[in-house]
């Protein structure tokens, strides 16, 4: 997957290219990330990238010309099929379904705003989609962009050691993930569930699915409202609720 990022702070993206899953993906050629800094497209001796908003008010906006030129340069490098995304609180909220949709694109250009935002005309003429990572305010679009890159890259074939790792992640099937355990078998009087030590793969699968359903019911019940549960899932969830009521 090819990724371009428009940012005033390209150094921040070393967190993506140099570390963890995404760092290995870059090293192995599965993920290609390039940055364009609007400061490199300025024409004054101060490399000015902010400007006053019309109508007054607090704060500044990103200057139009350097930002637009940076986007054009990224488009030229990416090719015509690249999708330009602006990270914005007004955008569609990112969830796993959205991540799956974005992962189908082979080329993405992410525009990271700063200050109070960017000129609306840039959004109208240069941006294909707006996306948000949540209903809160951050200082810029870099952290949301890194969040999006990390989430999307996990779905690129070969990035994770086993595709099952992505398939078992929380939200991959609309459910929260099940509990996980490692050694020791007993920790401060808390034991690993016996089924996980049994070696019975089918029983382990059923336990994990039931725990995933139950955890979703308890922590994010609204997620279940959007799912059409299979007969197996409905039975497991009913058993979970029954056991929970007995232990109440």
Curated annotation (Swiss-Prot):
Q: Which residues bind S-adenosyl-L-methionine?
A: 113, 133-138
| Enzyme kind, highest EC tier | transferase
Q: Which family does it belong to?
A: Belongs to the RNA methyltransferase TrmD family.
Q: Which residues form a coiled coil?
A: none
- SS bond list: none
Biological process (GO) annotations? tRNA N1-guanine methylation
**Cellular component per GO?**
cytosol
The cross-references to NCBIfam families, in alphabetical order and at most eight, read: PRK00026.1, trmD
Q: What is the catalytic activity of this protein?
A: guanosine(37) in tRNA + S-adenosyl-L-methionine = N(1)-methylguanosine(37) in tRNA + S-adenosyl-L-homocysteine + H(+)
Q: What does this protein do?
A: Specifically methylates guanosine-37 in various tRNAs.
Picking any one GO molecular function of the record gives: tRNA (guanine(37)-N1)-methyltransferase activity
Q: Which UniProt keywords apply?
A: Cytoplasm, Methyltransferase, S-adenosyl-L-methionine, Transferase, tRNA processing
**Localization:** Cytoplasm
Q: Does the keyword Transmembrane helix apply?
A: no
Recorded protein name is: tRNA (guanine-N(1)-)-methyltransferase
Annotated EC: 2.1.1.228
Tell me how this protein assembles.
Answer: Homodimer.
């Amino acid at each position: 997957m090819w990724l371009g990022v428009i940012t005033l702070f390209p150094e921040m993206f070393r967190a993506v290219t140099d570390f963890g899953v995404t760092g290995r993906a870059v090293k192995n050629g599965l993920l290609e990330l390039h940055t364009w800094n609007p400061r490199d497209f300025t024409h004054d001796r101060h490399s000015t990238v902010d400007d006053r908003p019309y109508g007054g008010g607090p704060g500044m906006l990103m200057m139009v010309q350097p930002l637009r030129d940076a986007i054009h340069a990224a488009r030229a490098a990416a090719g015509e099929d690249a999708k330009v995304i602006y990270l914005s609180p007004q955008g569609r909220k990112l969830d796993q379904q959205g991540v799956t949709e974005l992962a189908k694109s082979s080329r993405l250009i992410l525009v990271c705003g700063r200050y109070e935002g960017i000129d609306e005309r840039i959004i109208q003429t240069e941006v294909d989609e707006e996306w948000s990572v949540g209903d809160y305010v951050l200082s810029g679009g870099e952290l949301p962009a890194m969040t999006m890159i990390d989430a999307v890259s996990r779905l690129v074939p070969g990035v994770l050691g086993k595709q099952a790792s992505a398939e078992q992640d929380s939200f991959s099937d609309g459910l929260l993930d099940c509990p996980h355990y490692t050694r020791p078998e007993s920790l401060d009087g808390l034991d690993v569930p016996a089924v996980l030590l049994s070696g019975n793969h089918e029983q382990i699968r059923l336990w994990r699915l039931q725990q995933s359903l139950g955890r979703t019911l308890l922590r994010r019940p609204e997620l279940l409202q959007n799912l059409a549960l299979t007969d197996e899932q409905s039975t497991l969830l009913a058993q979970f609720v029954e056991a929970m009521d007995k232990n109440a």
